[in-house]
Amino acid sequence: MSPSTSSKGKSSGLNQHYEEKVRPCIDLVDSLRSLGVEKDLNLPAIAVIGDQSSGKSSVLEALSGVALPRGTGIVTRCPLVLKLKKISKDNNWHQWHGLMSYRDQTKKLKDPAEIENAVLKAQTVLAGTGEGISHEMITLEIQSSDVPDLTLIDLPGIARVATGNQPKDIEKQIKDLIEKYIKRQETISLVVVPANIDIATTEALQMASKVDSTGQRTLGILTKPDLVDKGMEETVVRTVNNQVIQLKKGYMIVKCRGQQDINEKLDLVEALEKERHFFDEHAHFRSLLEEGKATIPLLAERLTKELVEHITKTLPQLQKQLEMKLEKTTEDLRALGAGVPTDEHEKNNFLIAKIRQFIDALEGIKKAEEDLRSSDMRVFTKIRKEFDRWKTVLDAKTIKTEETLRDEVEEYVGTRRGRELPGFVNYRTFENIVKKHIEELEEPALKLLKDVTDIVHSCVNRIVSSHFKAFSHLLRATKDPIEDFLDEQFQKAEEKIHSQFKMERIVYSQDHLYSNKLDTVKQNLKVLGQRPFISAEVREMAQHLTAYFMITSDHLANQVPLIVQYHILDQYISQLQNAMLAMIGRNNPGMLLQEDSDVARKRRELKERLERLKSAGKVLSKFVHSV
């Protein structure tokens, strides 16, 4: 069997095997891409990359059967999605059909000769009149009996140096665009490399290797085999046979139309015959044809097979991606809330509903029942931690008092003893020591007030922002009472704490409480330790002081938190709730509900994304149930 016969046999068998599977798989991804979900999901794709003048455009031209822009410099200035759809030969009306779309424009093409100018015009619209590039996509769909079932994404050729009107950083711009596509695990990189150069030096192969170090997603295509220097043919053969730089998907080699062929008006059909003849007659490259590694027709079959297998392989992950994006988009849209109605009556009801939701959220704080979706810990849990710290301060003070009382009492007795006989406790000394220690606790109590106020303030601000962030006027109208009422309640709580400590400096306790506590202290031999040489009067006073401080500590451990909670939580929240209810009848709903343009835009984008994802879900579901 001759090489050409062998090639035809392979083609026929492959088409029969894949005929029922190929088009639905490729149509699935094309449908998803046409819905615009490529903004949201990583779709399976084959991206064609190569250095400038690598022959990339010629390969695509040969695969599609139409002349694409070619020449020196940057020819491809935008990503070009090339959708090739094979149709039946007996349908004359659909013998050839072209459709180009970009942004919101669509153009039907009746003749293959129109394509080159149509692509150039589209690139000018998207990338400007200079030589810059754009990330915006052009889609070119071709239906013909002479094309394979295949979709490719053509990316700009890599420029090493900016020339002419090109931006100074053109190399970086192009590489960033290419990397955006090829770094995705869902993308197969089709790397086009001239056969007459050292492939290790090509930027395209280096870029592919950077994001796909094992070559799992990379297929190498060698071009321009007719330009290989004599003596280098075996190196090319070794490269195609994966013996130089190894890729899991390997290499293929093709010969496309050169400039001389174009000048001589060699059409694409004749070019394919010329290519087959070249490999058939070549002493070194004939073996590559026999092994199915050469010519455009075999490359087309290989790419179709690779794409179908890749789509099938990535489908479960695509479904998972879609579900996650749907959930996230739905949640984001819910967080933004519904848009403002246009009817004035409905607008008023909308405002009432928004304010009541806010009031309910405030009530949740007060009752320690708030929604935890926006926070990892309830406000009252944080406040309780502050109350516990206050109790720790009191306990530490009591322990410190026990340790230092001896010296303090001795100092007072030694310097301030009056006419009392030995053994009599000086009550004035007792009072002075009590007042001194009580004063030292006032500052930590005020710090507790400030810390709890900060917690409540932060929480209320977070809640008001989550409810009203879309409405700047309503947000501002709410901010004033938030600050004013909090300042008011803070001052009231502060005054009460000052008053509380003034009262604590008045030494008093119920007799039975004091006596019971004193008995406990006297029974505890650790109060003053077993320190020798301590006088009876010092021991006696120290025991009385310790007993009194324990009573005071228990009292303050509850009283200060009650003052703080009453004013900063209960009174403040209630005052704020009443002010919000009063706002309903006092203000113009239309003015309060003027929505920020950024929020409206974001809601619109989220709604559009949700619709895209839902449509994509239907397409995916239909495909899964049909196979």
From Swiss-Prot:
Residues that bind GTP: 50-57, 154-158, 223-226
Keyword GTP-binding among UniProt keywords: yes
Segments forming domain Dynamin-type G: 40-316
Cross-referenced InterPro entries: Dynamin (IPR022812), Dynamin_GTPase (IPR001401), Dynamin_GTPase_CS (IPR019762), Dynamin_N (IPR045063), Dynamin_stalk (IPR000375), G_DYNAMIN_dom (IPR030381), GED (IPR003130), GED_dom (IPR020850)
GO molecular function: GTP binding; GTPase activity; microtubule binding
SUPFAM superfamilies noted in UniProt: P-loop containing nucleoside triphosphate hydrolases (SSF52540)
Keywords in alphabetical order: Cytoplasm, GTP-binding, Nucleotide-binding
G5 motif: annotated segments: 255-258
Region described as G4 motif: 223-226
GO cellular component, one term: presynapse
Subcellular location: Cytoplasm
Record domain GED: where: 538-627
Induction: By interferons.
Stretches the record annotates as G2 motif: 75-77
Region: G1 motif, residue numbers: 50-57
Chain intervals for the UniProt region annotation (G3 motif): 154-157
Gene Ontology BP annotations: defense response to virus; receptor internalization; synaptic vesicle budding from presynaptic endocytic zone membrane
PANTHER family per record: DYNAMIN, INTERFERON-INDUCED GTP-BINDING PROTEIN MXC-RELATED
Annotated family: Belongs to the TRAFAC class dynamin-like GTPase superfamily. Dynamin/Fzo/YdjA family.
Protein name as it appears in the record: Interferon-induced GTP-binding protein Mx
Lineage, uppermost ranks: Eukaryota, Metazoa, Chordata, Craniata, Vertebrata
Gene that this sequence comes from: mx
